[in-house]
Amino acid sequence: MEIDIFEDKENKVFNRREIKFYVEYEGEATPKITDIKSKLVALLNSKKESTVVDNVQPHYGEPKALGYAKVYETVEDLEYIETKSVIAKNTEASEEAEEDEE
């Protein structure tokens, strides 16, 4: 899986960076959002807790997808602005299991 970032815009109103990217995945299924998020965190040198992948739209008939991610300044900004559904789909199964145990 390769990620090619083609737009990185600063949004000062929401204290975040807005990232648009292409994901290329030759010979495999469309990657999970959590896998894409992990790779983006490494590429952008951001914190995993303050990064969300908003959506990934596969191209029909091609091993390629268009994605949109947001990197917030703080976790508090992310929790205040993002919907629970976006936060939930960016949470890994192991993190959810830990929260259920508490």
Curated annotation (Swiss-Prot):
One Gene Ontology BP term is: translation
Q: Does the keyword Ribonucleoprotein apply?
A: yes
Record keywords: Cell membrane included? no
Alphabetical GO CC annotations of the entry are: ribonucleoprotein complex; ribosome
Tell me a Gene Ontology molecular-function term this record carries: structural constituent of ribosome
The cross-references to InterPro entries, in alphabetical order and at most eight, read: Nucleotide-bd_a/b_plait_sf, Ribosomal_eS24, Ribosomal_eS24_CS, Ribosomal_uL23/eL15/eS24_sf
Q: What are the UniProt keywords, alphabetically?
A: Ribonucleoprotein, Ribosomal protein
- Short name of one Pfam family: Ribosomal_S24e
Signal sequence: where? none
Annotated HAMAP family: Ribosomal_eS24
Which family would the database say this protein is a member of?
Belongs to the eukaryotic ribosomal protein eS24 family.
Q: What is this protein called?
A: Small ribosomal subunit protein eS24
